[in-house]
Every structure is written in C-alpha cells, then in structure tokens.
C-alpha cells in the first residue's frame, strides 16, 4: 500500500538544500544516477553495490523511509550512494545548478504516487516545469527512465515527456511499453506488482539534441 504525503502542504514546500556532488561522493568524476521517489531505497542499494563506476542519489518525500535507507547504506559501507529527504519539485532545482556539465547521466521516476482524484493531480511529481528542469540538466544521450503500475499515470508522464520534444525513446526499447525492466534490479513496488500479477508500464528515453530557448 502506498503511504501518501501531500507535497503541496506548507511543510513540504520548504526548501531542503542538498549538498553539492563533491560533498556527497568520494569519487566525484563518476556519472550520477538520480532516482526520484526512491522509497526505501532497495533498488539503489542493489544498483550501487553492483555498479562501482556510478554514483547514485535517491530523493524521497517520506522522511522515515530516507532514515531507514541511509542507515542501511551506512551499514553496507556504500560510498557511491546517498539518500536525502526532500520534495523533488522544490529542492532539486538549486542542486541541478551545482552540477558540472555531463555529470548527471540518468534519472529514474519509478511508481510515483498516482493521486487518482482529478483535483489532486497537480501533486504528481512529473509536470511540464519539472521536465524542463530535467531537460536543462541532462546532456545529450543521458537517460530518463519511467515506470508505473497505473496506466493513467504512465500515459500522463509519457505525454508530458514526448510533447516536450527534449527526449526520444531509446531505439533499443522503442515499443510502446517495455516488457522488461532494462536494469538488473527492481524497486520494492515493482516486485510487489509482479507478485500480484499487476501489469507494469515502462519506457526509457534519452535526451536528444533539441536546444532549450
């Protein structure tokens, strides 16, 4: 079951400043994978343990999950991984400005809170403004991966991304939806959905050469 928090409430509108990359990771010359809405962080913990040539950052709006994820990261001694509590739509813009060109190589948004009621849809994490920030921060060829078990959420994310013209579907995964996760590991939510026989919708994009005016 998803545990929702309202990202538009006053508390979650406060800016939580994320450290600059050089203050986050031991090896700052490695590419960064940013996972937005990382939940308990099991996906990134597995990815970081298996990919020493990448740095990983997970951000999550539910603070207890961040505490648990960061505690496990420390226990495992993973220096190429960090977790932070923040509202991505509020706190990431300034952090993006601290990045060197080409430093952010992959962004994933996996199973975001669906906010089914029409009046609540403005709470969804991916909107046109936030996508514009991602397009500004990702170099040509960098990846954007999305997935959800709610078709209406997936359709909305796909529409926002493709109407922006900043991203193209990855040629290797150009079908309407990916049948399999392109990564070696899954999130907790994906494992649960698969176990329950729920269909998962996915798409992998890369940043194209369309400039930002």
Swiss-Prot record:
Gene Ontology MF, one: tRNA (guanine(46)-N7)-methyltransferase activity
The keyword Metal-binding is annotated on this UniProt entry: no
Cleavable signal peptide: none
Residues the record marks as active site: 113
Record's keyword terms, sorted: Methyltransferase, S-adenosyl-L-methionine, Transferase, tRNA processing
GO cellular component, one term: tRNA methyltransferase complex
Pathway where it operates: tRNA modification; N(7)-methylguanine-tRNA biosynthesis
Annotated substrate binding sites: 117, 149
Catalytic activity: guanosine(46) in tRNA + S-adenosyl-L-methionine = N(7)-methylguanosine(46) in tRNA + S-adenosyl-L-homocysteine
EC number: 2.1.1.33
Entry keyword S-adenosyl-L-methionine: yes
Chain residues that bind S-adenosyl-L-methionine: 35, 60, 87, 113
Broad enzyme group: transferase
Domain of life: Bacteria
Similarity annotation: Belongs to the class I-like SAM-binding methyltransferase superfamily. TrmB family.
Role description: Catalyzes the formation of N(7)-methylguanine at position 46 (m7G46) in tRNA.
Protein name according to UniProt: tRNA (guanine-N(7)-)-methyltransferase
Lineage of the organism: Bacteria, Bacillati, Cyanobacteriota, Cyanophyceae, Synechococcales
């Amino acid at each position: 079951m998803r545990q929702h928090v309202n990202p538009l409430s006053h508390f979650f509108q406060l800016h939580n400043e994320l450290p600059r990359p050089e203050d986050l990771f031991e090896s700052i010359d490695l590419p960064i994978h940013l996972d937005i809405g990382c939940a308990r962080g099991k996906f990134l913990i597995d990815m970081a343990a298996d990919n020493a040539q990448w740095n990983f950052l997970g951000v999550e709006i539910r603070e207890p999950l961040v505490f648990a994820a960061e505690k496990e990261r420390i226990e495992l001694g993973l220096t190429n991984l960090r977790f932070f509590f923040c509202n991505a739509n509020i706190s990431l813009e300034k952090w993006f400005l601290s990045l060197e060109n080409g430093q952010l190589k992959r962004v994933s948004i996996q199973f975001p809170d669906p906010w089914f009621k029409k009046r609540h849809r403005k709470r969804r994490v991916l909107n046109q403004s936030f996508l514009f920030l991602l397009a500004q921060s990702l170099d040509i060829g960098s990846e954007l991966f999305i997935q959800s078990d709610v078709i209406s959420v997936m359709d909305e994310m796909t529409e926002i991304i493709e109407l922006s013209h900043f991203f193209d579907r990855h040629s290797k995964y150009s079908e309407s939806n990916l049948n399999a996760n392109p990564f070696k590991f899954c999130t907790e939510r994906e494992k649960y959905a698969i176990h329950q026989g729920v269909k998962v919708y996915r798409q992998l994009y890369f940043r194209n050469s369309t400039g930002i005016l």
